[in-house]
């Protein structure tokens, strides 16, 4: 019989991510394990991880997917080095009230503009220019992003020829583009886990639209130049033999030291609140969020259970 905790571990208290490759993922004696070709088992603490990135060479059993869903852990099927996302398994947190709230903000042009302006302000530390449309703000953002990449390249002494990479061919990109791709992939994974845990839809974006992870890109872009992208340039400067591995380890440390997972859901709520509309109350029979926060006693002298 599979043992499960009474409540999933809150997202903010979890390890950010784990990358797995070349093995069969299954549940044996109640444990989530990776079995390699020689039969060696590696235990994976599935309930204490925000998302598990599954690289080429992995096969996942029904029991493993079921256990991951029960403990609120996101499974993401990615390409080599995590530079391409093929699919993800939602851990069961989406709710109609949250989705309708998000969709209303995205479908109303005035509300959408308010949200985009808030994203701009959070990303660049200053209010968005007045009387600009979403398309115009997107253009201003793109120009600033290109300038930021060039500035980081100069700061770290890295040759920069622009953001150029082929997601179908990892080896084709130069070292800096490989590092950036690996870093942003890590950030996208934990951001998607946070969005799903909060009950929202990764596909309903505001700046980005028409992609399965549009909202993921929106939220991740707010913090990527304060977290993972500078580290990608720092690692690329050393020209390591395994840039993707070094970047992943560095990102994991950044997420832990900066408490990224603890900040993501409040950031998501702050961005959506810019629309200045009241979120609908959940129905009485609404499904609870995938990873609920522990109930506090309301006394600073007591710890929540």
Curated annotation (Swiss-Prot):
Nuclease activity partially inhibited by CasE. It is found in: Cytoplasm. The keyword Nuclease applies. The keyword DNA damage applies. Changing residue 217 to A: No effect on in vitro protospacer integration. Alone significantly decreased protospacer acquisition in vivo. Gene3D superfamilies: CRISPR-associated endonuclease Cas1, C-terminal domain, CRISPR-associated endonuclease Cas1, N-terminal domain. Coiled coil: none annotated. GO terms for cellular component: cytoplasm. InterPro entries: Cas1, Cas1_I-E, CRISPR-assoc_Cas1, CRISPR-assoc_Cas1_C, CRISPR-assoc_Cas1_ECOLI, CRISPR-assoc_Cas1_N. Changing residue 256 to E: Loss of spacer acquisition. Signal peptide: none annotated. Residues 278-305 are annotated as: Disordered. Changing residue 22 to A: Slightly decreased spacer acquisition in vivo. Keywords: Antiviral defense, Cytoplasm, DNA damage, DNA repair, DNA-binding, Endonuclease, Hydrolase, Magnesium, Metal-binding, Nuclease. Belongs to the CRISPR-associated endonuclease Cas1 family. This is CRISPR-associated endonuclease Cas1. It comes from Escherichia coli (strain K12). The lineage of its organism: Bacteria, Pseudomonadati, Pseudomonadota, Gammaproteobacteria, Enterobacterales.
């Amino acid at each position: 019989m599979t043992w499960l905790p009474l409540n999933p571990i809150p997202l903010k208290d979890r390890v950010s991510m784990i990358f797995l490759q070349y093995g069969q993922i299954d549940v044996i004696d109640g444990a989530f394990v990776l079995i390699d070709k020689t039969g060696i088992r590696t235990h994976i603490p599935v309930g204490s991880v925000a998302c598990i990135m599954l690289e080429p060479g992995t096969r996942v059993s029904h029991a493993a997917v079921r256990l991951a869903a029960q403990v609120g852990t996101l499974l993401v099927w990615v390409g080599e080095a995590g530079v391409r996302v093929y699919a993800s398994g939602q851990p069961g947190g989406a709710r109609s009230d949250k989705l309708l709230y998000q969709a209303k903000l995205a479908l109303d042009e005035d509300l959408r503009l308010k949200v985009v302006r808030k994203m701009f302000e959070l990303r660049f530390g200053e209010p968005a220019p007045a009387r600009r449309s979403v398309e115009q703000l997107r253009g201003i953002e793109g120009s600033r992003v290109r300038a930021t990449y060039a500035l980081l390249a100069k700061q770290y002494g890295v040759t920069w020829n622009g953001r150029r990479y082929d997601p179908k061919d990892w080896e084709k990109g130069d070292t800096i583009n490989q590092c950036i791709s690996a870093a942003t992939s890590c950030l996208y994974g934990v951001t998607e886990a946070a969005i799903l845990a909060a009950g929202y839809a990764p596909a309903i974006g505001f700046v980005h639209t028409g992609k399965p992870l549009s909202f993921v890109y929106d939220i991740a872009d707010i913090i990527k130049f304060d977290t993972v992208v500078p580290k990608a340039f720092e690692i690329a400067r050393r020209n390591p033999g395994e840039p993707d591995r070094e970047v992943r380890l560095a990102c994991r440390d950044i997420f832990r030291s900066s408490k990224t997972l603890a900040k993501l859901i409040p950031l998501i709520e702050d961005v959506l609140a810019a629309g200045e509309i009241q979120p609908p109350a959940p129905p009485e029979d609404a499904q609870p969020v995938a990873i609920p926060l522990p109930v506090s006693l309301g006394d600073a002298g007591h710890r929540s259970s």
